[in-house]
Amino acid sequence: MKITNAAFVRSVSDLSDLPEESFPEIVFAGRSNVGKSSLLNSLTGRKGLAKTSSTPGKTRLINYFLLNDNLYFVDIPGYGYAAVSHAEKDAWGRLLAGYVGDRAAIALVVLLLDSRHPAMKSDRDMMDFLAYHDRPYGIVLTKDDKLTQKERTHAKRATESCAMNAGFIVSYSSVSGKGKNELLDHFDRYL
């Protein structure tokens, strides 16, 4: 897959505001502050396309980006962030369950795991949720540049042991771009 253009389309806080299902959607999911926005910016080559923050929980809406005029990248709120109210967590949970569970246009869910803390309980719960809804998914181990080779090997093995249904596992660095071409090649298989 080659990305020639990318643009922000809209943010959605209610399922009734989702765009028409006219293009396939690749959804980016993961814990808060795992690097979803950085990954989107790295993949598209557009540094400020998705807003990044060092503060967890900044993405609170479903954000749509149109790529090549025929594909959506969708950035969804991170899970596992403790500093929001229970009511807000419940609202996010209902929004995401409705979106991921029912949206026919979803071609692939890309589950991002911090390679320094792979396969935490919340990540395993998300894998179970995706399997329950029969959603194809792949895993991206983010922040690869922060690990030694030994730590990378351990992170990949730990992830493989609990991600039996994942279509792929890619180690990725948004800083260096390591893993970018491999990940884009995987996307082609689902479109």
Curated annotation (Swiss-Prot):
Gene3D superfamilies: P-loop containing nucleotide triphosphate hydrolases. GO terms for cellular component: cytosol. Its cofactor is Mg(2+). Mg(2+) binds at residues 37, 59. One of its GO terms (molecular function) is GTP binding. GTP binds at residues 30-37, 57-61, 75-78, 142-145, 172-174. Residues 22-191 form the EngB-type G domain. GO terms for biological process: division septum assembly. It holds the Pfam family MMR_HSR1. Belongs to the TRAFAC class TrmE-Era-EngA-EngB-Septin-like GTPase superfamily. EngB GTPase family. This is Probable GTP-binding protein EngB. It comes from Chlorobium phaeovibrioides (strain DSM 265 / 1930).
